[in-house]
Amino acid sequence: MPRVKSNVVRLKRKKQILKHAKGAFGGRSKLWKAAKETVERGWRYAYRDRKNKKRDFRRLWIVRINAAARLHDMSYNAFINGLHASGIEVDRKVLADLAVREPEAFAAIAEQAKKALDAKVAAA
């Protein structure tokens, strides 16, 4: 089997890792082993936090919707239940945005949800 020299490939890989490590403190941006560990750890955190970001934003939207719904004398749970009962299909991201940027539109949606909830309770 012929001998394989990996000089070009190895240097290219090292260059990429050191490029990603730029901005790290001290030897973490200069020394190969430390830089490699730093970059790989950073990639692990980035992968994990891309998943956590979705959870965090959903939690933020729910907090905002809850606060806005309570201004209209409804809990978050009752508000969402009323939305389903009235057939309004708006996701939490849009609802949270409406609650912050357009309170009048959110108030109209909350009123419809409240009516649908009252009708649902009266029917039961």
Swiss-Prot record:
Query: Which BP terms does GO give this entry?
Result: ribosomal large subunit assembly; translation
- Record's keyword annotation contains Hydrolase: no
Name of the protein described by the UniProt record? Large ribosomal subunit protein bL20
Instruction: Output a single Gene Ontology CC term carried by this record.
Output: ribonucleoprotein complex
For this protein, what is any one GO molecular function term?
structural constituent of ribosome
This chain's function reads:
Binds directly to 23S ribosomal RNA and is necessary for the in vitro assembly process of the 50S ribosomal subunit. It is not involved in the protein synthesizing functions of that subunit.
Regarding protein family, the annotation reads: Belongs to the bacterial ribosomal protein bL20 family.
